[in-house]
Amino acid sequence: MAPPNKSSNRNKSNNNNNKNKVKSKKSKRSIDETPEALDLDQAAISKSIVYKRGDCNKGIKKLVKEFRQVMEPYTATKLQETSDNTTKDFVNIAAHYGVSHLVGFSSTDIGSYMAMARLPKGPTTTFKIQEYSFQRDVAKAKIRPTSFEKSYLNSPLVVLNGFTRGTPHLEMVQNMVQSLFPSINVYTLKLSTCKRVVLFNYNKETDNVEFRHYAIKVSNVGVNRSIKRIIQSKIPDISNLGDISDYVMNGLGATESDYEDANDGQVELSSKMINSKAKNIKLERKGLDINTTQKRAIKLEEIGPRMNLSLLKVEDDLYKGEVLYHQYIKKSDIEKEEAKLRRDEAKIEKERRRKDQEANVDKKIKEKERKRKYLDQGNEDKHSDDDDEEWYRKEVGENPDETFKNNRKSRSTGGGRPNKKFKSKK
């Protein structure tokens, strides 16, 4: 049998080492590109749970799933709730997972509703959903719908429009929406992570809040539309043309729905700012300068869903407490004071019942402890009787007779005294 070739084994080991080095480099690069590597304090990031309350129709169930996509990545995307789950169940698990907000959807025979609540002590804002559209409906209105899977790796930016100061309930809605999404630091924010925008627009004429969800797209400025189609997509079929200039000069690759370069949407950005770290490394390897600035056009493309919301009420606690604003019910100062007194009395009664319940629980625990000690003492007496019988067998060599057992019982019961007391005869 021929001896193994040492040189070939050495080459194989070197190849394996090189492969391991390549794998380690790739793994390090993938770790740097994860969205958790952002310059954000993970502990201070707003996290949410989007769920349905009670029995809902199919439309609201689908709207819940799509709104979870809006709140990604800091939400429970694969949450599976049932009709038996209550808000209290989600409040109990929220503290364990560091959840800061709850968004609940519900539907009745009258209409559909969306409630936003801040944990742990409120406030809660409840909206009535006047109209809504799904992502599918928005995509049908487009000529060329696109996919936005990679856009959900980072949280969206929030834009509030029309919320003027001086109106208390609108200011509370504004604060609620701002705290619902993670805050950003303009000095450390990477533009390459800005992929989506969420818009809340207050319409004074209809007194509704319009919700929209957009994707951010950046395109080059000053490039012919036909050239754009060649750069951004596959090369079109130009076999029936005599020269490439016919395609470019005649605008055969352009359509009416293509984006028009508007001056108000143009900014100067460098490749380093808008590209990811991995893409910038590839450009540097090709010898391209990523720090040179160019004019770019920013475009917003709607993703969906859409919602038109009307503010129904604002509560100062978690789904309860004082109603600070109600769309239909207006109370006088006297009625507000009476309602406050009733809430205070209910709190006092609840606290009294809680203390009584705790006292009853402590009493039952002490009673169980007393019974346990009594049973343990009885078991010890039984074991001592067994030891006496064993001692008698060893010393005498016979089983104990009835006289020995009766004497032992009389000792254990206190000298043969009767357990029951009898009345003396007169």
From Swiss-Prot:
Keywords: Coiled coil. InterPro entries: Brix, PPAN-like. PROSITE patterns: BRIX. One of its GO terms (molecular function) is rRNA binding. GO terms for cellular component: preribosome, large subunit precursor. Residues 1-19 have a biased composition (Low complexity). This is Peter Pan-like protein. It comes from Dictyostelium discoideum. The gene is ppan.
